[in-house]
A protein has these predicted regions:
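Extended hydrophobic packing segments that form well-structured cores
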Residues: 375-499
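Cap/lid and interdomain-hinge subdomains that line or gate substrate/regulatory clefts
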Residues: 45-47, 104, 109-244
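Short catalytic helix/loop segments, enriched in acidic residues and glycine
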Residues: 25-41
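Short beta-strand segments enriched in small/hydrophobic residues
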Residues: 3-26, 175-184
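Short, well-structured alpha-helical segments in soluble
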Residues: 60-73, 90-92, 260-269
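Long, internal scaffold/assembly segments composed of regular secondary structure
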Residues: 231-232, 236-324
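Periplasmic-binding protein-like
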Residues: 73-83, 101-103, 272-277
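C-terminal catalytic subdomain
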Residues: 300-425
Length: 499
């Protein structure tokens, strides 16, 4: 499953011709060195491309429009090496349509106290030029990322690399297409939403298909293809029979193999990157898709249960943003299920009926076939595991009627105090920040859903930057959250974001 194209980022340095050719030569030389060193650092998920120094209105405008036209360009990093009169940037910025980062840095890290003169001052005045440029971008109301510090500082490089992933999420958002297999679960509110507004805001296409249309693809899968995939399952996972006859167990597993192959063929043929199902409308499917959906998520597809297309799109988006990350720990659809309220051991047990992505699993993954009361179908095969420990974020995109809101909660994943042998699903257990009581109150006050798109591999800052680029509200629930401040923030936001 492809998770986006091989994007690149342009590095554009601002200056002017006031200082003479020698100064401009050094500006270009310094810019080249920075780009070369950044690319050599191994810190960046995408290549940075040096561009000639921008010193005139015409060149700035031409460069930004070339960036617009280049499908491989995911964004522009701007740096003002010298002073660069900001009126020169107006037309270029006005016509630019991709992610923008202002790297507010300078070539030298330390002031050369013994030798500094006015030539050096004119040549190295980012503190001056960056403010001029920043003023104009702010006046024009353009959303961008500002990162200030020395370019060789590891923390600055980490922030710039982090922004790259957000920029790719911004670019790829308009390529997300969600296949709805049947409609939302009846009478459920939070999984509903304005699909037209979502396409206008995020670029998402959300289409519905009768369940039996996709079921035909499942029925057309050959027994030979099913047998090959079942063999892969048996080689990869621990099979826990729970007393079932081995052949009967294998038949249930084979049903999910057929669903996985059929669904994937349908999604590839129709060019969808996310899918939703609903246990209340399974048509001719023999089982609720469980193992099949888990495997599709692991391949990069988004998923939402009970028709939740917003969460399906967010899971896909976050998988794209985290793609290729070293030591990636996983991204999945999740659902808040039940609490542990023992003082000092508070947390939320996260799971779903079946569909938690094994990318978040810690250690060996097992397969079980167990009854499922919902759906009125055969006992479905599913992958069973517990999730990794460590920090992550849970996000929820909700439709408030007049606008979308993205909730972002920082969480700490932990191991449960005891094993849960009778619970045949993939699970995670986390304590939300700042604590369970405050986080739950804040989540409910902000209107968050019971479904989330969860990841270990992205940060609240990255998702908040994505929301800002989309022009929607982001509500952070983290270690600094208090209910009083959050309630005030929600009131202020309602005035700013409401139509």
């Amino acid at each position: 499953m492809k998770t986006g194209r091989n994007y690149k980022f342009w590095f554009c340095t601002g200056s002017q011709d006031l200082y003479g050719d020698e100064c401009l030569r050094k500006v270009a030389e310094h810019s080249c060195i920075i780009v070369e060193e950044l690319n050599k650092s191994g810190m960046f998920p995408y290549e940075i491309i040096w561009k000639p120094t921008l010193i005139t209105n015409e060149l700035i405008r031409k460069t930004f429009n070339e960036a617009n036209a280049d499908e491989d360009c995911a964004g522009v990093i701007t740096w003002m090496h010298t002073f660069s009169p900001a009126k020169s940037w107006i037309l270029g910025l006005k016509e630019y349509r991709k992610p923008l980062c202002h790297l507010h840095t300078q070539f030298n890290q330390e002031i050369p106290y013994d030798t500094i003169d006015m030539d050096f001052m004119n040549e190295n005045q980012s503190a001056h030029g960056g403010r001029e440029y920043g003023h104009m971008v702010t006046r024009m109301g353009i959303e961008r990322k500002v990162i200030a510090g020395h370019w060789a500082d590891k923390k600055i490089q980490e922030r710039l690399a982090s922004w790259m992933r957000t920029a790719v999420g911004i670019m790829e958002s308009s390529h997300i297409r969600v296949c709805r297999v049947a409609d939302n679960m009846r009478n459920v509110a939070v999984t509903e939403g304005d699909k037209v507004e979502a396409q206008m805001k995020f670029g998402w296409e959300i289409d519905a298909y009768p369940v039996n249309e996709i079921a035909e693809y499942v029925q057309d899968v050959s027994q030979g293809d099913i047998d090959v995939l079942v063999e892969e399952y048996y080689n990869k996972y621990d099979m826990i029979l729970d007393g079932r006859d081995p052949e009967e167990f294998k038949k249930h597993v084979a049903v999910q193999a057929g669903i996985e192959i059929g669904f994937e063929r349908f999604l590839e043929e129709k060019n969808y990157q996310a899918i939703v199902t609903h246990f209340g409308d399974l048509g001719s499917l023999k089982q609720l898709p469980g193992l099949a959906i888990q495997r599709l998520m692991e391949k990069g597809y988004g998923f939402g249960g009970e028709g939740d297309w917003k969460t399906a799109a967010m899971v896909r988006l976050m998988k794209i943003m985290a793609a290729g990350k070293k030591d990636a720990r996983g991204t999945s659809f999740m659902e808040d299920y039940t609490y542990n309220l023992v003082p000092g051991k508070e947390g939320i047990l996260e799971a779903h009926m079946l569909e938690v992505c094994p990318s978040v699993a810690d250690g060996k993954v097992s397969m079980r076939v167990c009854p499922l009361s919902m759906g009125d179908r055969e006992d479905p095969a599913r992958l069973v595991f517990t999730s990794k420990t460590g920090p992550g974020i849970a996000t929820s995109l909700v439709d408030l009627g007049d606008r979308f809101r993205l909730l972002i909660n920082e969480v700490e994943c932990k191991k449960t105090e005891k094993p849960m042998p009778a619970l045949p699903v993939g699970t995670a257990f986390w304590t939300p920040k700042p604590d369970l009581s405050t986080a739950a109150e804040a989540w409910i006050l902000a209107g968050g859903a019971h479904h989330t798109a969860f990841t270990y591999d992205l940060t609240a800052e990255q998702m908040g930057d994505w929301a800002a680029a989309m022009g929607i509200e982001a509500v952070y629930i983290d270690g600094d959250t208090t209910i009083r401040n959050l309630q005030n923030e929600l009131r202020w936001n309602s005035m700013y974001f409401s139509k």
